[in-house]
A protein has these predicted regions:
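Divalent-metal-activated hydrolytic enzyme cores
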Residues: 1-15, 26-127
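Conserved functional hotspot residues or short segments at active or partner-binding sites
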Residues: 19
Length: 127
């Protein structure tokens, strides 16, 4: 996935990369459920998803958010988006250079399934 962003930004001059998550994300909810009540014979594909999402959402289980399922999922969605943005900003020498030298902007946003509104909570792209 990082390679796709590197290719688009390096080859075609793309200057905005948006990590777009969405409200009520099933993958986030499934990860939180798996962390709370692990299943013994989890599918390898589900295990892969949980392993990718776990680092960004697991710390939330130790907060008061853990008592409110809806709030927990909402915060976990944004935490996962932030983690993905951070991975793009700091996990690739190519992207780091493009950010520093060529103005590549990598931001996180959340699409609301109920309203259709996209919230650029992690930085609004400038016109």
């Amino acid at each position: 996935q990082v390679g796709s962003v590197e290719f688009a930004a390096g080859r075609f001059g793309t200057r905005l990369a948006v990590v777009l998550g969405h409200t009520q994300c099933g993958a986030i909810a499934a990860t939180l459920e798996e962390l709370r009540q692990p299943t013994p014979h989890q599918s390898p594909n589900l295990h892969s998803i949980v392993d990718r999402i776990r680092p960004s959402v697991e710390p939330l289980l130790a907060t008061p958010l853990a008592q409110d399922a809806d709030a927990l999922v909402a915060h976990a969605v944004r935490a996962n988006i932030r983690a993905a943005v951070d991975h793009l900003r700091h996990g690739s020498a190519v992207l780091e250079r493009l950010v520093a030298e060529e103005g590549l902007l990598i931001v996180g946003a959340e699409y609301c399934l109920e309203t259709g509104v996209v919230d650029f909570f992690d930085g609004v792209p400038e016109a």
